[in-house]
Amino acid sequence: MAEEGIAAGGVMDVNTALQEVLKTALIHDGLARGIREAAKALDKRQAHLCVLASNCDEPMYVKLVEALLAEHQINLIKVDDNKKLGEWVGLCKIDREGKPRKVVGCSCVVVKDYGKESQAKDVIEEYFKCKK
């Protein structure tokens, strides 16, 4: 029992916590994937968190998203690869071995609903508190 608590309650880094939060939000239908859905969610102030890919090849996307985030004081996390982000938010097929294939790149994701309280959500919120 104690070992299980350490495994589950060990120190979680921000990337792992982000993956967990995105997965939970996806299950509870709380994600806006892609620039159009993300911009609509940000404009309606439904967003809790925004994730943007650093390798987004359209500078106007980045400008639009960052402007909306600044206007509504919404937190931003940048990830290095849009393919990785696409995989995290379910924009891929999973083969028999459980490996993702046909991954579609996703440059912007907005979390509208965390789904449920979790340690990962707390890690993300703590990360933003420390950042300010």
UniProtKB/Swiss-Prot annotation:
What is the superkingdom listed in this entry's lineage?
Eukaryota
Listed under GO biological process in this entry are: maintenance of translational fidelity; positive regulation of canonical Wnt signaling pathway; ribosomal small subunit biogenesis
List of residues that carry N6-succinyllysine = 129
Q: What is its main location?
A: nucleus
- Carrying N-acetylalanine, the residues are 2
Q: Which cysteines are joined by disulfide bonds?
A: none
- Give me the Gene Ontology terms describing cellular component: cytosolic large ribosomal subunit; cytosolic ribosome; cytosolic small ribosomal subunit; nucleolus; small-subunit processome; synapse
A Gene Ontology molecular function term for this protein is: structural constituent of ribosome
Compartments where found: Nucleus, Nucleolus
Keyword set includes Membrane = no
Task: Write down the PROSITE patterns for this protein, in alphabetical order.
Answer: RIBOSOMAL_S12E
Entry keyword set:
Acetylation, Nucleus, Ribonucleoprotein, Ribosomal protein
Q: Which PANTHER family match?
A: 40S RIBOSOMAL PROTEIN S12
The family line of this record is: Belongs to the eukaryotic ribosomal protein eS12 family.
This chain's function reads: Part of the small subunit (SSU) processome, first precursor of the small eukaryotic ribosomal subunit. During the assembly of the SSU processome in the nucleolus, many ribosome biogenesis factors, an RNA chaperone and ribosomal proteins associate with the nascent pre-rRNA and work in concert to generate RNA folding, modifications, rearrangements and cleavage as well as targeted degradation of pre-ribosomal RNA by the RNA exosome. Subunit of the 40S ribosomal complex.
Query: What quaternary arrangement does the UniProt entry report?
Result: Part of the small subunit (SSU) processome, composed of more than 70 proteins and the RNA chaperone small nucleolar RNA (snoRNA) U3. Subunit of the 40S ribosomal complex.
Q: What is this protein called?
A: Small ribosomal subunit protein eS12
Organism of this sequence = Rattus norvegicus (Rat)
